[in-house]
Amino acid sequence: MNEELIQGGLHTDARGVLRFCNDFDMSAVKRFYTISNSAEQPVRGWIGHKKETKWFFPLRGRTEIGVESFGQDLQDGQDFGFRVSSSECRVRINEENAKGSSARFILNANEPKVLKVPPGNWFKIVQDGNAEVMVFSDCKVGEFENDDFRREL
């Protein structure tokens, strides 16, 4: 899986709170966005990329991120039931042979860390209450055509 957890820090004084992650090298980042799931649907995923790297940084609350490596068939690019949705430009995956090893990470805004999820992995985001996470990507929208994979929860 090769995911990486980059330690950050927190400084509080009379002026307020400073959250940081000074060891996060952002030279590969090309865009960013934030995610805050709705109370009705606190789970988002499974989403996978063969080429794109994602980094996650907690802005507010607690976010759990499950990471699972692609199964060997998907890594090898074998067709085992891909269904392409041209309207969404996403590939939907047949569940069998799609999974590999897995890990779970808890990101909390009060304990700043950056989670790196390299290509070749699925991720799932579960958020509590009003949690919000910032996501960084190493590609522009549309840069890697057909690199957006979906799996059932």
Task: Locate the predicted segments by residue.
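Non-catalytic, conserved peripheral segments adjacent to functional cores
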Residues: 1-71, 75, 100-111, 130-153
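Surface-exposed beta-strand edges and flanking loops
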Residues: 7, 86, 93-95, 109, ...
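Intrinsic disorder/low-complexity segments
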Residues: 69-103
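Conserved metal-binding segment of the jelly-roll/cupin
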Residues: 107-129
